[in-house]
UniProtKB/Swiss-Prot annotation:
Keyword check for Chloroplast: no
Bias kind Low complexity: ranges: 21-33
Record's keyword terms, sorted: Cytoplasm, Phosphoprotein
Expression tissues: Expressed in the brain, with higher expression in the hippocampus, hypothalamus and olfactory bulb.
Residue segments, region Disordered: 1-75, 145-174, 188-281, 310-344, 364-396, 460-485
Protein's UniProt name: G-protein coupled receptor-associated sorting protein 1
Designated gene of the protein: Gprasp1
Biased composition (Basic residues): 211-226, 316-325
Biased composition (Polar residues): 461-484
Biological processes, Gene Ontology terms: endosome to lysosome transport; G protein-coupled receptor catabolic process
Phylogenetic placement of the source organism: Eukaryota, Metazoa, Chordata, Craniata, Vertebrata
Amino acid sequence: MTRAEVEPGAQAKAENKPGDENANAAEVEPEAPLVVRPKVRTQIMTGARPKVKPKGTPGARPKGETSTPGGAYAKCKPKAIPIARSKHDAQVWAPNKFRGESMSKMGKQCQISAADPPLLSNDSGMVAQAKCLPVDRELANMDTESIPKKANSPAGFQPSYGSEEGTNMGSWYRARPVPKGEAYENSDFKWADKPSGSPSFWNRDEASTRFRPRKSMKANNRFRHMAKQEANTMPRHKNKQEFYNISSSDSEDESGKTPWFWPKDKTKVWSKPKEEPNSRSWFRSKKEVRVESTSGSECENPTKSLFWSGEEAKSRSKPRARKGVNMRARQQAKREACSDAMSGAIDTNKKESWFLPEEKANVFSKSKTKKEPRTRAVPKEEVKTKARASTKQEARPEEEVLVGAWFWDTQESTMADRISIKTTFVEEEPIVGDWFWSEEEASVDSETCHTSRPRAKEEQVSSFCLGSGKKSSMESGPKATSKSMPVAKEDEVVIGSWFWADDEEINLQADDESIFGSWFWGTGENSLRSVGVNCEKMPKAGEKEVTDSWFWAGDVNTEAEVEEQARSASTKATIFVPWFWSEKQPNMDLGSEPCSDIMAGAEEEPIIGPWFWAKVDNSVEAEVNSKSSLEDEEEPIRSPWFGAREQTDMKYAAGIRYKPMAEAEDANKKSCVWAKEPCLYPTNRECLKSTLGEKEDTVDPWLWSNNYPRTKTITGSWLWAAEEGNIDDETGEKIKLPTLEDNAFNSWFWKENEESIVEAPKREEFRPEAEEEDIIGSWFWAGDEDRFEPAAKINEENKIASEDEDTVGSWFWGNEEASLEAVRRGTFESAPGIKEEKVTGSWFWTDKAKVGAGSQTVETGSETEEEAIFESLIWAAKKDSIQAGVKRVSKPKDDGNIAVGSWLWSSDKATKEAKTLIVSEASPENGKESVVKFGSRAKDEVINKTGSGDNCKHSTEAETIVGAWFWEGDEASFESNPVPVCKAVCEPESSAEHEPDPSRRPQSWDEVTVQFKAGPWGKAGFPPMNPFRFPKEAASLFAEMFGGKPKLVEVGPEREPEPQFPFQYDPSYRSVREIREHLKARESAQPENWSCNCIQCELRIGSEEFEELLLLMDRNRDPFIHEISKIAMGMRGASQFTRDFIRNSGVVSLIEALLNYPSSRVRTRFLENMVRMAPPYPDLNMIETYVCQICEDTFDYDLDSPDQLSGLTMITHLTATSDYHKVVVNYLAGFFYLLNSGNTKTRFHVLKLLLNLSENLVMTKRLLVTDSVSEFMDLINREESDENIQIVLAIFETISKHIQKEALFSDDDDDDEEEDAVNLEPFISAFREAEKIAKELKRKPGNQKAP
């Protein structure tokens, strides 16, 4: 990390103008004429353009804008850039925690290695450079550069992490040609490689950060994917400074670039820890310091990009801080200065803070001049960020620009500067990583690292991490990787770092895989948190590199250290680990980070998993270690998790926008999305705890990885929620608890084919090779009560502007060929297959309210001209449904266009309605514009529903898994331990209903009884005729309505069950007009003179009730109710039992009872299944037990009570066949008691039950043995209703028929003893008497059939 390391890049870096704040480059010991400012850390980024003309940096753009489109704007020879940069990057990186050698190897892949190196570089060469620049320098720089502020701050800013501060993480991607104004900025990141053209992020020069030139800073803050944006991001002052992301425009090394940042502590975090790569990043944040992302004006920051959750709004203003990582680092000391400096610019920055969104043109407006070219280079990604400011990028068509943004919060007014990077790659696609972290009081620092993938073959990976600090809110910005580390106050340490390493060549070769890891951690007040991440990457089949990083926050002053270890292995594997945790006090926010893009041979399959876990209490320790070594065929595994601290307070806004431009073949684009804050989150101290196994908490959305022979880029995003104390990054306002606001996030992205880019500026090659597969994954969640506001804000500044594509919201992902399988874990796996296939899936979840969500995705084939469209709609609101729709169109090829619109979220009941609308549309190439539309409205209740999940498999061997899920949050706050509402599983839409779970069956009749309450509509004109209690026999009614009378299932000769009461329309049913006339005629006639057997008369439906029935049918679409209505109208046939039930209940009362108790169908379905499904099964023990329970409960009810009548009706229905006769006959004594003691209605039901038993010869013998004949004669001799007497006569007639077959009695071997006891004499005499009575009844006029 010494200058030497930096040297190659340093020279370039030296380019930084001496005048730059970062001019401290001088401090850096620039080599040669190049004045390298440590701040600039140009060395690493040869491509970066220092303010000073970098001589060494061919790719760097000196302050003066170099015309070189190659990506070198600097006067320096562009030539050096590619090589130098990559090399340097690699070298620099090498010193860094990330393995240097690896990096150096990667160096070949300048971009990639460069990309990795940037992160490392912070520690290493860059760091060295930065080291050169002490905090003092930083201050000096800032001060010095206050004039140039805008321009220089970015540049100097990078290196600005003085060595004391820790080398600044401020290095970044390659330098990109920048107008001289920009040069120093670039120099910050200069990379030797133009291709590396990825800009790193950092806050502007610290000086600039510090300096008032917030505006320029602004540009910086808001880094955009696009170079132009990036350029814009640079302080405006430096119009030229645009080097932003786009620093190198080399077409070749695009992928190599990676942006990252890190903040330097006041003390050089880096240097102080180990200089070696391992020590690569440390952060110490001050408690007080607050880091903010500079994403635009504090308020305006509509951009998602910054967040900070400073406790104070001012923190927000400070966000500009990111201008200088140094700022950050030195800022500690100068926090306030930074604040000031930033504040001015901040506003502007805010907007640009991320994404290419144009945000406000204001950002970088000055830079525009030069930027424009940059922008151009970006191919019209139209970095659209305001930042893009029209920087013109002379990037090759294939160049891609990346922008990264992120945030951090610092507490208090201090601002920790955040770094944002903008990167543009000429040819390579850069990767952007975002993350956030918050510090407790202290600012949190986070660093992101990207790797960009090398050319067509290279793959980019981004990872995000975030941490939250105890008090500080955490915000995350999406995208650029940046690590800004506020100098920590002694009391607090914040650390965030992560990375992954990219192989030297990330070309996706069948055998190569890269691994990235990212993570964060936050420190609780004093608690130390440590997280370990292990990344492993295999450059070649034969090599395997592993990087490990982790950090922890030490108590107060502890520093976080990131360590990367590289290891080579014969096999390659990729591992990604994301996770986070939050400090105890601070809100724990979880973020998920998907970071992995593996390009492996067709056979390889990567797996990515994000997760979190939260710990209760203050301390959370999370360590993620994901290591995978695979044979060529093995698949990488990654596991993320995190712990949350109690009472985490975090706010998350994540936005990533990633637009890389690659060569035509390498048009792999990724689009990122961010979520706006105010995101939700658990405001509770509840910790989220999520383990891989159980995803108790939340949120893991994510990604996937692609396996392709070709390059791919991956972006990851995640979210978290902020607690009520948080400040909204964008607005700078304090975030209200979720109860107040709706949170919505989106996260987003997916990975597209190497060629395909989702939302990529260049859609150049959307189609992957035959075996390539695109996967897009996105998902969301709904914020709890909070309404999601950030989107709107984002919109406002970010605007992500028309050109940029911002995606907010949730969505989907599509797999090209592969199937997506949603894993409960939220993993999505897809393996590319030989053929292309795209699948899109989307889902949501919703807060506690019910959720209704529908998602629809359409994807069209991906060919060069293919266009993929994804749509997902989600909305959930309990009372007020929210609708969210995401629509995405992506076309490969230069002409491809992508449109993404999404919105969704739900808010809890308590949430106020929040409405945000973001529209982002981006078309690759010249005409790109991005519009993001984010509309959300949350009403009292939110309902989220997972609409769908797609599953596809691409390659035989390789698989990618992406999982998404959601959970519900509590009313007032986001639930720290949300429970997944659903698991997205691909299963046939027509999945059969599951049989009832025996363990859930009622143990007593009480569990099945349903008592209905009067419904609100009862007062609306349909009052029940009489109190109605839903009878238990309704189960059989429903069973009958949907499958015929359960019991009456007969097996025909062909062994096919034939329901005895099949439902069919009666061809002779009357029309409504005819029924009305008939009912009126009946009412006008005398009851004794009216005789009609039509269904209306049988059901005793009156004219008034019939009209109510028609209204109910018209107002309701419930099939149950329509079936009942059709029976009542004679349109459907029904069994006698069903007709009796409807008549006794009253058709309107029955329907209203059903309407009043929506869950009745669930309960009755259980009975229906028991009654209907049991007979076909040989084991009837369960049903027999149930029948016994009904009989016993019936006798226990009050005599003649409705419950008792309901039980008798059910038993009568169950005895319609002989299946349960042996069970019921054991209770004959009880039934005869009811026959003697009950009223007419009770006797009627008992007689019908006995009539059913008499049909069975064996039961007939039991009836005769129990002396039932005398009981029947008593009924005949006393005054009894004609209906009951007719039933008694029917019983006698049935018994008589059996007696006539006396042989049957003697043939029964089972009842020998009873045979002797049967005495037929009493029955014969009784029968003769009954015969006389029957004849008398027949003579009576108006005799009607028993009911």
